[in-house]
């Protein structure tokens, strides 16, 4: 009941309505929190909710995340398919909690996000493959080779998808062992491969006294699924490695497996969840775009009719001091993709992904250094860097590019420029000269990294070139690299 007074009765009534509105908002907020709390206490949901909050805490401490285009994801939809450019291994883990808490920790989004990962992530020894070139101790690598991530990634709503490029001979032998049993190697591998294993075993025994080789024709599948035989089995599967019967079985098995995996992804969308998938099928190793995989068209055909398809891209600003920045950009929904021919579908998706690249100091600075090297002018000062970056920003702003937050302010830009130079000096990208001059070290641009390849400045240059091509010429201008 509202009480009014003779003096100031109108203001008192407005104040009463304001208090009532605040109370209703608080009650609505508490109802939302109670609903989420009850939902997240369920056994199947608790692990997902708990890990997402751990990831969110990690990002708050070590990564400064910026969200662009959150209004495209916020409205409810029957189902949402996120087509995301893939830059780092942790892209889906960063994307999920940021969109879940896009309106703040007290107003979580009730939608769950599933993501698609490479199939070998669900096999034993995947972690050993990831850290293979990190020069870890041998005992640690042996321990990782025995671990299986399936109990961890399954509660996070991870779904496998098979790709021939990542299917090794060892993966096939795991599949054979699970489906056909412990067969003799002679019934699986070709004579060429058996001879190769014998030669490798002899050479290894000459270097390692503990290794006791046995003729490969006396071994069974389980005998070589150990750490000792891991090295020769990690090469990509080839037809000549198998006997004809096993290769025919492998082809039929892959077709049935991929069909079942696509059906599982379609079921995720039919449940109304959000699905994260990389249309290029892998992490881009050079910053350029690769062709869209055919499975995207098949997945769109299985999705519900009103599925919302959103292009997403994450741009990392890591050439700085302090915390790395991650710019998560969500684009407007893509309509009518299921009706397009494959070539047109690929061009439209790649163009939409390229438009979501956010301009960062890392991209601008890398572009400047690369152009100076191409011009044969490796020496520069801070004023030259500042002038070139400001000019490039002006052109990109006119074309409608998005910039990371604060970069267009003069004071912030100067601070980012100094942080970029400091990073370059620490990482060996720049060499300090007398008189506040700097020289570009060309070696980091020429190195081919097997791990952490995204640290190469050419990676960042290719990202910016992809954005510029999309802004300038449209869909047909974006050159793709064969995947």
Locate predicted features:
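Non-catalytic C-terminal accessory region of glycerolipid acyltransferases
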Residues: 2-39, 163, 169-483
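A transmembrane-helix-recognition feature enriched in membrane-embedded lipid enzymes
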Residues: 5, 9-69, 94-97, 108-111, ...
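Conserved H-X4-D acyltransferase segment
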Residues: 55-133, 178, 183-212
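Short glycine-/polar-rich loops that comprise or flank the Walker A/P-loop
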Residues: 109-113, 155-157, 273, 305-308
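A basic- and aromatic-enriched beta-loop-alpha substructure that forms the phosphate/nucleotide-
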Residues: 125-188
């Amino acid at each position: 009941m509202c009480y009014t007074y003779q003096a100031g009765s109108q203001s008192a009534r407005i104040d009463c309505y304001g208090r009532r509105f605040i109370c209703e908002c608080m009650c609505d907020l508490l109802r939302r929190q109670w609903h989420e709390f009850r939902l997240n206490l369920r056994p199947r949901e608790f692990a997902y909710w708990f890990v997402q909050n751990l990831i969110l805490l990690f990002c708050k401490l070590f990564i400064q995340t910026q969200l662009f285009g959150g209004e495209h994801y916020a409205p409810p939809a029957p189902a949402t398919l996120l087509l995301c450019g893939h830059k780092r291994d942790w892209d889906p883990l960063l994307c999920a909690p940021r969109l879940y808490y896009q309106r703040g920790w007290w107003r979580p989004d009730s939608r769950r996000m599933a993501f698609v990962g490479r199939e070998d992530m669900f096999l034993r020894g995947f972690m050993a493959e990831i850290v293979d070139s990190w020069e870890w101790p041998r005992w640690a690598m042996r321990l990782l080779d025995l671990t299986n991530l399936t109990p961890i990634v399954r509660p996070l709503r991870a779904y496998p998808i098979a790709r021939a490029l990542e299917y090794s001979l060892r993966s096939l032998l795991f599949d054979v062992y699970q489906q056909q049993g412990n067969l003799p190697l002679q019934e699986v591998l070709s004579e060429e491969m058996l001879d190769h294993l014998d030669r490798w075993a002899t050479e290894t025994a000459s270097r390692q006294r503990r290794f006791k080789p046995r003729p490969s024709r006396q071994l069974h599948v389980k005998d070589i699924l150990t750490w000792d035989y891991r090295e020769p089995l990690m090469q990509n599967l080839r037809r000549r490695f198998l006997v004809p019967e096993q290769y025919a079985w492998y082809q039929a098995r892959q077709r049935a497996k991929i069909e079942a995996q696509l059906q599982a992804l379609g079921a995720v969308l039919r449940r109304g969840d959000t699905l994260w998938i990389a249309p290029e099928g892998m992490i881009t190793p050079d910053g350029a775009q690769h062709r869209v995989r055919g499975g995207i068209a098949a997945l769109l055909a299985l999705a519900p009719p009103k599925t919302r398809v959103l292009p997403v891209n994450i741009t990392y600003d890591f050439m700085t001091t302090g915390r790395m920045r991650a710019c998560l950009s969500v684009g407007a929904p893509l309509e009518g993709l299921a009706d397009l021919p494959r070539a047109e579908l690929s061009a439209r998706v790649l163009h939409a992904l390229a438009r979501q690249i956010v301009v960062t100091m890392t991209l601008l600075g890398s572009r400047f250094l690369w152009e100076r090297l191409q011009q044969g002018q490796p020496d520069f000062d801070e004023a030259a860097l500042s002038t070139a970056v400001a000019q490039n920003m002006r052109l990109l702003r006119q074309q409608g590019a998005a910039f990371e937050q604060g970069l267009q302010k003069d004071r912030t830009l100067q601070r980012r420029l100094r942080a970029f130079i400091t990073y370059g000096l620490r990482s060996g990208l720049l060499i300090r000269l007398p008189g506040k001059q700097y020289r570009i070290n060309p070696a980091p641009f020429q190195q081919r990294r097997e791990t952490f390849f995204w640290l190469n400045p050419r990676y960042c240059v290719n990202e910016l070139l992809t954005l510029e091509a999309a802004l300038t010429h449209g869909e047909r201008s974006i050159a793709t690299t064969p995947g």
